[in-house]
Amino acid sequence: MGMTRSVAKVLAAMIATAAVPAAAEAAKCGNDAGGFPAWVEAYKDEAAGRGISRATLDKAFANVSYARATIRADRGQKSFKLSLEQFMQKRGGQAIIRRGKSLKKQNAALFERIESRYGVPAGPLLAIWGMETGFGGFLGKEHTISAVATLAYDCRRSEYFTNQLNATMQLVQKGILSTSARGAAHGEIGQTQFLPANVLKYAVDGDGNGRIDLVGSKADALASTANFLRGHGWSAGGGYQPGQGNFGALQGWNAASVYQRAIAIIGAEIDGD
């Protein structure tokens, strides 16, 4: 006797479900280290399905571990809750202004070239550079892939950081990011702290040597930052204080209001020199 259509549909659904790899079922976020190894294996299967080579994935995850320091940092971002005055003091706003003015003079040709191409003046670029890494003095010490993978696994912002991890794998496959790279706690890369997806979208070769190096080349880092701001609506010659047209581009750089206002103030002080 032949099967009815309804029975056939049920059996087909059961077979399809059984065919899903066990790893894919394990690709669920978690809030502690316990499920991280299984999640990594599931993610590798998913990434391979999106075109990342197995060789790249095996190399990228060879030394990845659950980054507890990253989780602590993610849960403890208290400085963004400070008043503007407190934030400026904590982040050394006046010191950034003083050094920024000096660096603007020392690198005048570089900043003129960047402004000519992207329309962004030196002030906000120096403000971001100083605020993010002390002008390249401290880029972070966390293993980048571990940091991004941990945040992708963590339930708090899993979807957002899974997208960042996808971008990270593309950077590794393209040879732009080393599997041993270290940086900030959330996986930010380079002298102005680009998240991996923004590296893919906005990073440029600012020094003309044929490659992109946001860690070792200030020209690449600063030109890429200017390209990011232009990509977020920066208009050449416009103001960038709150209420002015280019302030929205600074909002695109960082979501914290106190950070945005600090960058605007510091940049104006530097540009006013």
Positions of PLM-derived features:
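Bacterial N-terminal signal peptides that target proteins for export
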Residues: 1-11
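Hydrophobic alpha-helical segments
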Residues: 9-10, 23, 44, 112, ...
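C-terminal segment of classical bacterial N-terminal signal peptides
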Residues: 17-25
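Cleaved targeting-peptide boundary
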Residues: 24-33
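Mature N-terminal segment immediately following signal peptide/propeptide cleavage
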Residues: 32-54, 58
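Catalytic glycan-binding domains that act on GlcNAc-containing polysaccharides
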Residues: 52-273
